[in-house]
Structures are given as C-alpha cells and as structure tokens.
Amino acid sequence: MGEYELRKLENLKAELDTKLHNQGMDQSVSTMIDMRGLVIRLNNAIFFDSGSAEIKKQSEDTLVEVAGLLNTIDNYIRVEGHTDNVPIRRSNYPSNWELSTARAVNVVKLFIDKCNFSPDKLIAVGYGEFKPVADNATAEGRAKNRRIDVIVLSSKYDNLEEQLVK
C-alpha cells in the first residue's frame, strides 16, 4: 500500500472513528488498518439476533452512516461474515458457514439498496468459524469471533479482483 493510499485510509478511519464515537457506537464498532486495507469490525450482537441473518432495524442507521462514508471512495469493499465455533441448533441455517455468508450478503444488499453502492465494487464472503480472532474456549473469545468485517481493500487488490471476474 502506497503512502498516499495509506493517508487516505487513515483519514477515512479518523472520520469513521469520530462519527462512531459521536453516536456512542465505538464499543460496538471498531476500525483498524492492516495489510488488506481499512477494516471496520462490527459486533454481531448489535447488528444481528443469535442464529439470524436479518439486520436489526435499530442498527441499520449505523450501517447506513458507515456506508455513506465508504461510498465516497473507489476501492473494492469486502464484507466478511464470521461466527464462533458453537454449532447452530435453532436456525434456518444448517451451519455457521451459511449463517456467516447470509449475514455478509445482507450487509451488501443494504449497501446497494439503501446507500446506492455499485454492486460491482462489493464482495460478500462467509468464513463461519474458520477465521477466529480470539479463543473460542471462552465466552468473551466467542463473542469477539461473532462479527462482520467490512474491509475497504487496498487498491493493490483491484487488478486481482478484476482478473478473477473475467
């Protein structure tokens, strides 16, 4: 990632952090920059009921606010769904993998339907329990693993993404 792009993502991160703090959402949504780009991490408990892929109505405004800032840039945006490793028991989804994918797809659909995103710049991915950020042995770790990551991809991935869809 070049210096110009890094500054652009850092400015976007600062803008998001301020907006989230002003809305009291900074405990439920966090941001960081890593080698992939700007990562916006959403705590699933705020945005989804357990075992459900439907975005909670009271959380839609936060997603729309975040999307409004992201819609000003040209980068690809990948929405990743993640779960803990506890098997689903009462759900329309046979596995955590399918649940995580459905959640990612619903966030992408919201970005398109309510925020006028271009569908060709959005990617929905479900990882289920297979990319944890914390230990699934504790309740706290499982809670951290239940998340949606909205990633503003570094432009170094643009050519790769365009080649994959050809």
Predicted regions and their residues:
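Periplasmic OmpA-like peptidoglycan-binding domain that tethers envelope proteins to the cell wall
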Residues: 12, 41, 47-62, 72, ...
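Generic recognition of flexible, low-complexity loop/linker segments
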Residues: 27-28, 66, 137
